[in-house]
Amino acid sequence: MAVAPINMVRRVAEYALTEIPAEKISLGIPNYGYDWPLPYEQGVTKAETINNLQAIGIAIDHGVPIQFDETAMTPYFRYWQSGVQHEVWFEDVRSLKAKFDLIKELDLSGVGYWQIMNYFRANWLLLADMFEIKEGIL
């Protein structure tokens, strides 16, 4: 359960462009992940919201490899804790780059972040590398 799978983000953005001019659309970028206990039951299972560095730390602590879903363009992994399997989806440089590339491809006005308080240095380095920021806006 990716936070913002690029295939779905693309569909929403392309639909939005049929109704709204590109210069009025900013793409929302998640700056967090979810740690889901499994099995998932709709309406019952609740995920814990974690930041991207916490996600990486959990993978390291549990010695599990981080996988990458090529369709969603999103990293994820599974681990066990106290007899419960968990699945973690979060953002990394690869997933962020896919979203930034989409902004350029569709000529959108910029980005907005759902959660800016979770510092993820790689995001800001990539953002500065790919875009010119003027007067506090992208």
Label each PLM-derived region with a short phrase.
Residues 27, 103, 111:
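Conserved, mostly hydrophobic/aromatic
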